[in-house]
Amino acid sequence: MTDGPLIVQSDKTLLLDVDHVLSTECRRAIAPFAELERSPEHIHTYRLTNLGLWNARAAGHDAEQVIDTLIKYSRYAVPHSLLVDVAETMSRYGRLRLEADPVHGLILVTTDTGVLEEVIRAKKIQPLLGARIDKETIAVLPSQRGQIKQSLLRLGWPAEDFAGYVDGQAHEIALKQEDWKIRPYQELAAEGFWHGGSGVVVLPCGAGKTIVGAAAMAHAKATTLILVTNTIAARQWREELLKRTTLNEDEIGEYSGAKKEIRPVTIATYQVMTKKKNGVYAHLDLFDSYDWGLIIYDEVHLLPAPIFRFTADIQSRRRLGLTATLVREDGMEGEVFSLIGPKRFDVPWKEIEAQGYIAPAECIEVRVNLTEAERLSYATAEPEERYRYCATTRTKRNVVEELVAHHAGEQILVIGQYIDQLDDLSETLGVPLIKGDTPQKERERLFAAFRTGEVTCLVVSKVANF
């Protein structure tokens, strides 16, 4: 036993004692390979996952580094079975490689013939393959580049993709750093993506992911398709690109419900891309309608499933995913890894906060109790309904009212998930509410009023995160 800040458990959870003198150092050390699940006041819970370990491997970390880190900071002996599992899992990444071939177009190459024998016997892999070239190499149908990466990941053998990319149609784009300067971590993020070819950059909210996208575009110097969550985000991207790059208004198009402009830089919304007409996704051909050199997926953790299917067919295009989290509600993190690419850059928000680039955040957990009536309902409710009882308890509303009153005059956002609860809070507090059915112009007006201080308190649903 040592006096480390970390408790490593055999179920792959890591418990970090945030009050320990080495907690910040430990947090920074485990961030490349462990995923934060919960961060209450005293103990933060992280988890080791296959994808997290493979992302770390893709970023250049090896199993020895991960194991040494766990042992160094662990308060108790690290379970041997977990150490073996970490080493075995990380060794799986890169044993298979996709490469371009002048004769066959695309080939799958291995450093371990046993692994290749295993995967070519898999029923879902066989239709994607061509002729066996030698004991270490087999041809892959070029049109199945995305599909085979998905299938190999599901088998537990994530392939490294070295097959290269098309340049796309050239278009001059440069950063215009006259009255601003790119931050060091933004530059590192763009360079990390570019050297990796395709992949995901993870940065906290407010850290300037749009600037990373602009820097990637300056690297590519090619036509670019940018996919965003909604029209507000599209217009924010447009404003930032006009301000930060040499692009002018005629070079940037908006492809949304309101407009259908295709320009050298086109910003499209997920909503319009996934809109069906007569049962067909009528707008997905935008991916193929232009010789894009770069495709940027903003808030990639929200990427709709239909776009994954089309992304599988455009693996020869450079793809950049931007997000504050790799966790998806639908559990499709593996699709992001295989089709967009592995994590190329990640920096903890605490580091950026310490450098003064984002406002300091003080997180405080306030625990509340259910009322007697709610306790009875909770006890008899179905398991899937119990979370809602806790989330919408009347006691929580009382606490919100007290907090808003205590911070009167400050800029306050009240964020929630359940619309009926938010409707009630909006009415009780006498403040505006932004939710899914709030018209676009009204959203923009309220956000603008909040930014200027005209409105000091807003109640918002999850749409505020889009």
Predicted regions and their residues:
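Conserved helicase ATPase core of P-loop NTP-dependent helicases/translocases
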Residues: 251-254, 260, 413-415, 420-424, ...
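Post-DEXD/H (motif II) to motif III coupling segment of the RecA-like Helicase ATP-binding lobe
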Residues: 293-294, 299-364
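Conserved helix-turn-beta segment of the N-terminal RecA-like "Helicase ATP-binding" lobe
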Residues: 231-258
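Conserved pre-motif I regulatory segment
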Residues: 167-202
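Walker A/P-loop
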Residues: 195-217
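Conserved helix/coil segment N-terminal to the catalytic DExD/H
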Residues: 256-294, 305-310
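Conserved interdomain hinge at the start of the Helicase C-terminal
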Residues: 378-417, 423-424
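Extended alpha-helical interface modules used as scaffolds for assembling large macromolecular complexes
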Residues: 1-169
